[in-house]
């Protein structure tokens, strides 16, 4: 059976307009701006990861960072190395991560590299824990909560970023996809605390007992993502794999088992359109198990970051074989 690529058209044209926070008041929406596309292939395979990457028509060149989650020890839903290896190797990518801010098995570089090795990632590519030698900051233009985003120092060594995200639920954000992966994921350990506290502290010993209102955290996460998109310009692309759809993130050492079936591989040059497409497909699914993931998303107000985005009805195109 030949794969089908769905091209989902969105009226949202930028992360700025989509989040409703960073620079939302900057400019009116330009009606002539190109509408972003989201591609979907239902069958999840290494071959189709490469096919959907090529459909984006944006070549990853130079020193390429592949941002993904190596998964917390004890977890099992993260993207498997056997699935992603051909794509990572095709782009000659380095798998990049930053240390966590909540303790656990990836809170320092030595433990994080061990987790990456135990999960099979070091066998397919070089793994760079980008904040092993410190952090640097990127400006957040027009941010409500953040004026700068603290990222792993080594991130500046890369020319292009392939954002390869496992779409699933998340205990704090409601769901995790491309936006979470480039915001909290690229943030240093202290930068993660900075986002979670909506710009109040980088001290990981203080953040968890003094969390801000939920919407402030979600807006800060969007602002940090905007810092990454501004930094990268056109040297970035986004792929979400919507499988193992647990309500819990890959940062959870004991995630709940998925209650609904896999959706497929989605890709876009626009992270907001991509994450919105994933959440739409969860809601449109005929799988009764979706109620658990929807409850997780909505109970955390997870759509707040995407609340100004309006996705039109999907159109279909047959994939090039």
Model-derived features: positions:
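Bacterial N-terminal signal peptides
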Residues: 7-16
